[in-house]
């Protein structure tokens, strides 16, 4: 509270926040995190100034699996791209090929373009706002519309050359809003079903409220799972492992 800003007689002290990690520079000793302003303590982050001390705990959760010698499709919506570009870079460093669908609501939302390009062999830039993004690399494509529509257009060869076919994909990782990930999960069994090979792994990063950040303590992050084959209903602590099977 000593360093917290004050407004009239109110101390604007922040509670603990669950943050999105973006990147790490080990040589310079830097950690980049992203705060999503959603009211309360997260809004106070905008009052921080360069040089203010910050206490970080973590990382919590589990590392995302980044196997080598596979073909992986990354599907990122908005803030999810801040996480996916580091995952994509790790996958490529391990020897995997990466097809990246990066989706945004508006043209002003895109950031870290160089990092996303470094995380992918091919990027499909998706934007709800026309005229869409101009690709920087010859192998990349652009699409005006939502990310599932972009995937359908790509799979149907409506975006030109298909550099990495869907049926080559061993793994799909989706990070974004609940609605976006649900739409991707539904499309895999609907309009895109014939384009994916049997047995591919599909992972979604669970969005849930966080509180203790100590793994399986407070149960604030409990999420319901329903097995699509048996109908069995279970719960998981998403703070322990944020990456779960997309179909559950």
Locations of the language-model features?
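Generic structural signal for buried aliphatic residues
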Residues: 1-3, 53-56, 221
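Ferredoxin-reductase
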Residues: 1-50
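Short, charged beta-turn/beta-strand-edge "cap" motif at the junction between a beta-strand
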Residues: 2-7, 58-63, 228
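Short, solvent-exposed loop/turn segments that connect beta-strands within catalytic domains
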Residues: 9-12, 28-29, 196-197, 228-233
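Short glycine/proline-enriched turns and hinge-like loops at secondary-structure junctions
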Residues: 12-14, 66-68, 215-216, 231-233
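FNR/FR-type flavoprotein reductase catalytic core
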Residues: 40-211
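Local cysteine-cluster metal-coordination motifs and their immediate loop/turn environment
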Residues: 83, 178-179, 208-244
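Extracellular/mature segments of secreted proteins
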Residues: 247-248
